[in-house]
Amino acid sequence: MGYRKLGRPSDQRRAMLRNLVTDFLKYGRITTTEARAKEVRSISEKMITLGKRGDLHARRQALAYILDESVVKKLFDEIAPKYKDRQGGYTRILKLGPRRGDGAPLVIIELV
């Protein structure tokens, strides 16, 4: 599968996505651009699947990507058990319309 470049060098893109995924799992919903939200959805769904696995290796893999240890704890103890009977599709993207400054399409991404 391909990926979006999001107009940044790879190190900046990775850092931005790690921050977005961490905040998304921390707060349960964030407002961002559509392209970023689609990337965040892909990564966060994989993180929730790791949380459902629940073993030590899965926890360490999540810690390698998510910046805040308390968010990993929340992922494994609160978020993942909520989706134990669901096979993917843990997130929802709602369109908001264009951003005032540059017209970029804004969306809300939230946990279902």
Curated annotation (Swiss-Prot):
GO annotation, cellular component aspect: cytosolic large ribosomal subunit
UniProt record, GO biological process: translation
InterPro entries listed in its UniProt record: Ribosomal_bL17, Ribosomal_bL17_CS, Ribosomal_bL17_sf
SUPFAM superfamilies to which the protein is assigned, alphabetical: Prokaryotic ribosomal protein L17
Gene3D superfamilies reported in the protein's UniProt record: Ribosomal protein L17
Gene Ontology molecular function, alphabetical: structural constituent of ribosome
One Pfam family it belongs to: Ribosomal_L17
Subunit structure: Part of the 50S ribosomal subunit. Contacts protein L32.
Family note: Belongs to the bacterial ribosomal protein bL17 family.
Protein name in the entry: Large ribosomal subunit protein bL17
Organism (species): Thermoanaerobacter pseudethanolicus (strain ATCC 33223 / 39E) (Clostridium thermohydrosulfuricum)
Encoding gene per record: rplQ
